[in-house]
Each structure stands twice: as structure tokens, then as C-alpha cells.
């Protein structure tokens, strides 16, 4: 394609960020990606992909990409917190996956983001060891990630003084 990649500047309460976007005008391509589970306005309806679409060996890569977009890792002097926002169904599946890949028990508790009837929840886990277990699952031996969040993982991994 010859369509030029344009860069935009987003200004929000989180700060200023550069971003690019892609416009897809091919009906065939749109139908193909819909068959792979890509949907419009995913925020309130996204479910974890079925194994016929996403093989289990790629779960951590999917979750890492999702975390890069809709998650956070907060490292402060007194606390560590891992958080992902999404639909209740998606988050419950992610909790199951974390429990299958870790020695720690991640309670199957999802919290409402806002006091309304929308399917918008979050999960949150704290403590160095529990958080590090999740982050190692997501990032170890990976080379595609959001650099800003990867650097926080490395900071947590190399942290000797934080014992929460």
C-alpha cells in the first residue's frame, strides 16, 4: 500500500502521546479480521478469543498486548500494583490463565470501574512476588511489547529494596 503513515498527538490527563492509526477500506480484509475475532468498540463486549482462533501457546502474548493497551503497572515507594480493565468475561479468563501459570492464587474477583450497568470491570493484584509472577509470564523471552511498560517490569525485576 502507498497510504502514508501519519503521526498524531494525543493530549489527555495522562500526558501527551504520539500515535498512528490505520484506516481499512477493503471489505474483504475487514471480513477476514472479523472472522479472527477483531470487533468494533471492543470495550464493553470483548471476550477472550476461542482456542480455534488463538492457540493456548499464544495466550501470554495476547494478554501482554491487551495489558499494553488496557493495563497498568504502578511501582511506588510503598506499593506495587498490577491492573487490567476489561469485560467481566475477559478478565475471569485471564485470572484462570494466571492461576494455571503461577504458584500464587489469584482470587477470581473483578471490580466495577464505575457505578453503572456497563460491562466494564478491572482486576488488581499487589505485592512484589505476585505481581512479578504475572509480569514474568507475560514478558519473559518476549520481544514485542510496549517499551514503557516493559521498562517498569525490568525495574520491578531488578528491585532489591522493594519487598512488599
Task: Show the residue positions of the predicted features.
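Internal intein/HINT superfamily modules and their associated LAGLIDADG
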Residues: 1-164
Amino acid at each position: 500500500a502507498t497510504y502514508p503513515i501519519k503521526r498524531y498527538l494525543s493530549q489527555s490527563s495522562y500526558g501527551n502521546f504520539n500515535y498512528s492509526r490505520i484506516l481499512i477500506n477493503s471489505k474483504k480484509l475487514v471480513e477476514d479480521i472479523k472472522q479472527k475475532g477483531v470487533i468494533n468498540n471492543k470495550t464493553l463486549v470483548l471476550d477472550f478469543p476461542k482456542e480455534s482462533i488463538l492457540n493456548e501457546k499464544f495466550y501470554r502474548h495476547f494478554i501482554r498486548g491487551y495489558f499494553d493497551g488496557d493495563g497498568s503497572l504502578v511501582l511506588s515507594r510503598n506499593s506495587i500494583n498490577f491492573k487490567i480493565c476489561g469485560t467481566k468475561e475477559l478478565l475471569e479468563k485471564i485470572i484462570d490463565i494466571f492461576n494455571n501459570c503461577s504458584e500464587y492464587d489469584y482470587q477470581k474477583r473483578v471490580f466495577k470501574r464505575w457505578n453503572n450497568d456497563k460491562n466494564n470491570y478491572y482486576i488488581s493484584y499487589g505485592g512484589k512476588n505476585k505481581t512479578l509472577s504475572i509480569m514474568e509470564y507475560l514478558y519473559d523471552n518476549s520481544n514485542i511489547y510496549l517499551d514503557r511498560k516493559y521498562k517498569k517490569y525490568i525495574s520491578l525485576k531488578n528491585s532489591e529494596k522493594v519487598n512488599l
